[in-house]
């Protein structure tokens, strides 16, 4: 482990340990990231000069008001497959004006399974000639390509990749859609999945999951419970979760297209939802003992926190220590922290991913 990586990780450990000390958690479990090639996503501007074009990012000056263009020829934090593809793709784009004209951004979405989706974003309308050139490029480089411009989306192959993780003595396949959120650090994501499954060990009754996304945690957690009800509001994520459940041949998960707030209303009988009836979901048929939550950065709303306090076990994955801290002030009135983890999902940044298991007092 290099000193620069160790220093940034230790700073996060110190910060989290101090911030959460009032909840008297057990010893912090720390899950490190690879030091390089850990990001499965990368986005670059394309900078055009009179006789050249290159990948670029912007560096803000001290006052934050001005930005300097930084040429990017390699990107060590991105997956090796992205780094290998970058010069090959750029050479092909430069050689074909149909593909390079008014191109202003290139996004990469890679997987451990070997699939790659490249999104080319333009400041011009894309025509049939562009589509033919993009098809030839996709075939030559063995990648999927998507072209975007204002009000236009052209898909060459698929607008998604399929990731595959080995976990709990089996393989899990995940559809990851170009425009939807996925965990960017696949190696740390696998560690998070394993930790969540370990936290669920010995759980009884059924599992409720809020904010399930594409079913990232839902699939492996389903092996630990007799029945699982997962909720998610975004339609594209719900469709991806349902595809993932079917592809992985798992038969004990139902997905409800509800927000956390809406689920609380439905569970407490305050409101009926046609979406539940259409999906043939009877919330009252579940006997929940554990709830799993992986909320957005804003954390969990007050009504949902009250709902969580009724569960025997709460497994909470957080991408924002500050909102986790605020939420724990409420949850530790009824529960105690019995597992505490830090996942270095975003090395070399101030961002921290953490996990807690809370059990009823």
From Swiss-Prot:
Catalytic activity entry: uridine(54) in tRNA + S-adenosyl-L-methionine = 5-methyluridine(54) in tRNA + S-adenosyl-L-homocysteine + H(+); uridine(341) in tmRNA + S-adenosyl-L-methionine = 5-methyluridine(341) in tmRNA + S-adenosyl-L-homocysteine + H(+)
Family note: Belongs to the class I-like SAM-binding methyltransferase superfamily. RNA M5U methyltransferase family. TrmA subfamily.
Enzyme class (EC, first level): transferase
Any one of the GO BP annotations: tRNA methylation
UniProt-recorded Gene Ontology molecular function terms: rRNA binding; tRNA (uracil(54)-C5)-methyltransferase activity, S-adenosyl methionine-dependent; tRNA binding
Protein name per the record: tRNA/tmRNA (uracil-C(5))-methyltransferase
NCBIfam families: trmA_only (TIGR02143)
Annotated Pfam families: tRNA_U5-meth_tr (PF05958)
Keywords: Methyltransferase, S-adenosyl-L-methionine, Transferase, tRNA processing
Organism, as annotated: Acinetobacter baumannii (strain AYE)
